[in-house]
A protein has these predicted regions:
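Bacterial signal peptide processing site
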Residues: 23-26
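C-terminal motif of bacterial Sec signal peptides marking the signal peptidase cleavage site
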Residues: 18-21
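Conserved C-terminal helix/tail region of periplasmic/extracytoplasmic solute-binding proteins
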Residues: 38, 277, 385-424
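Extracytoplasmic ligand-binding site segments that recognize negatively charged/polar headgroups
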Residues: 59-72, 88-95, 111-273
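Extracytoplasmic/periplasmic substrate-binding proteins
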Residues: 220-223, 262-329
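Short, polar/charged alpha-helical segment
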Residues: 42-50, 54-57, 62-84, 175
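N-terminal export leaders
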Residues: 6-10
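Mature extracytoplasmic/periplasmic domains
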Residues: 317-318, 322-392
Length: 424
């Protein structure tokens, strides 16, 4: 994999330093200082955070995202705030959730997990058990840039985020094709058309096996469920009887699709990097991306061909916002709040959508709320660099639907294993 270009990251990180100014307070290890429980006194938060090392637990399955986090946020946190960023890569967010629960069960105070990249069922699990710090997210200085009235932001898989989660970025399920070998005119625009396409091109399509750590595969299957049942809105709240009514049609659709898949559906990619490799090696014709900016970051990183482009079905393209949350027993909650606020800084939001920087997910802030001319310039410049690999934002918006309620996640994943893999 080729290295990620760092010039743009460095410029935007420097802009964040210049815009916000620097502090000269001396650092310590933060071990004897009590962290504030909220962000209402930001000067107090900054003072408590200086000298702390924040343990940020996040999914580590993307090398480009890992590098973006280290190279973009790490230097700013160190140079401006005196905070050491310790990125803790995990295979699945549930690993961090289980650690927080284990710390609670063991009676541990000052837990090792300071910040988690989280959403969906993992958020609901910690929220329901009272294991998340509350009352801080909407008091962050940059929280004013977030449209909290938008249900896509204020509700995480149908669950009210309150002030327990702060948004980081947005994502939307899209397919990626190579325009050098597939024409736009022949692309399927629905799950029904996809089935026809796959069986007309046997072995040229597959999808990620749904399951923990493979949310992209789960999302693909849920999109099929939405189409078969007549839409996404009815799945926003949990209804077991509706699942019982429509899940047989879902398994029938996927079972009929199976013999047309790569390797006759006898095996499935386990994660997106494996799917990308099959696509890059011309074994299949479609991969996927969650990035609102399309496959630009994958192209820049040499993961997929330079002629790759994103496309979506006409509807049922599931999208959401992803967040960071602080466990209630976090030892370095102040530093975690500073990280969360930095993620919402317009210069950082601009950096994350530029394909060459390797992250490529969409905004968590409402750009119209940014009034500072220099910050607006950074956002405008970033938007102008998306390139033609990205889907037109208007098309993305028209295809967008929200995700299903949390309980459906396990039903889809468990049901898929039982129905498609015989319970393996």
């Amino acid at each position: 994999m080729s290295p990620i270009p760092r010039r743009t990251v460095a410029k935007l990180a420097l802009a964040a330093l210049v815009i916000a100014g620097c502090s000269s307070t001396s650092a310590d290890d933060g071990s004897t200082r009590t962290s504030p429980s909220d962000a209402s006194d930001w000067d107090e938060v900054l003072a408590a955070a200086r000298g702390q090392a924040v343990n940020w637990y996040l999914w580590g399955g993307s090398e480009s995202i890992n590098a973006f986090v280290d190279d973009t946020y790490g230097p700013v946190l160190r140079d401006r705030f005196g905070i050491t960023l310790n990125r803790v890569p995990i295979a699945d967010t549930v690993d961090a959730v289980n650690q927080v629960i284990a710390q609670r069960d063991a009676g541990t105070t000052g837990g090792a997990v300071d910040l988690i990249w989280i959403n969906g069922e993992n958020f609901a699990t910690l929220r329901d058990q009272g294991l998340l710090l509350d009352g801080w997210a909407r008091d962050l200085p940059n929280a004013d840039l977030v449209d909290w009235d938008n249900p896509a932001v204020s509700r995480d898989f149908g669950v009210d985020v309150g002030a327990m989660e702060s948004p980081w970025s947005s994502a939307q399920f899209q397919f990626v094709y190579d325009s050098a070998r597939t024409s736009e005119a022949e692309l399927p625009r629905s799950y029904a058309e996809l089935s026809d396409w796959a069986c007309a091109h046997p072995g040229r399509f597959t999808y990620i096996a749904p399951g923990p750590g493979a949310f992209q595969g789960t999302r693909f299957v849920k999109g099929a469920l939405f189409e078969l049942s007549g839409g996404a809105s009815q799945w926003a709240t949990f209804d077991q009887s509706m699942w019982d009514e429509w899940s047989p049609a879902l398994w029938a659709y996927l079972d009929a699709l199976r013999p047309c898949l790569w390797r006759n559906g006898d095996t499935y990619p386990k994660e997106e990097n494996e799917l990308h490799r099959l696509f890059a090696n011309d074994e299949i014709d479609f991969t996927i991306t969650q990035a609102a900016v399309g496959p630009g970051a994958l192209i820049a990183d040499g993961v997929v061909p330079p002629t790759s482009k994103a496309f979506v079905f006409d509807t049922n393209s599931i999208g959401d916002v992803n967040y960071v949350a602080i466990p209630a027993d976090a030892r370095h909650a102040a530093a975690a709040m500073v990280v969360a606020n930095l993620l919402l800084d317009p210069s950082m939001q601009a950096a994350q959508i530029i394909p060459a920087n390797g992250f490529g997910l969409g905004y968590a802030i409402d750009p119209s709320r940014v009034t500072d001319p220099e910050q607006r310039g950074l956002l405008d410049d970033a938007a102008g660099r998306l390139g033609d690999a990205a889907v037109d934002p208007a098309v993305l918006s028209s295809a967008l639907v929200g995700d299903a309620a949390v309980p459906y996640q396990d039903l889809v994943e468990t049901g898929w294993r039982d129905q498609l893999l015989g319970g393996l």
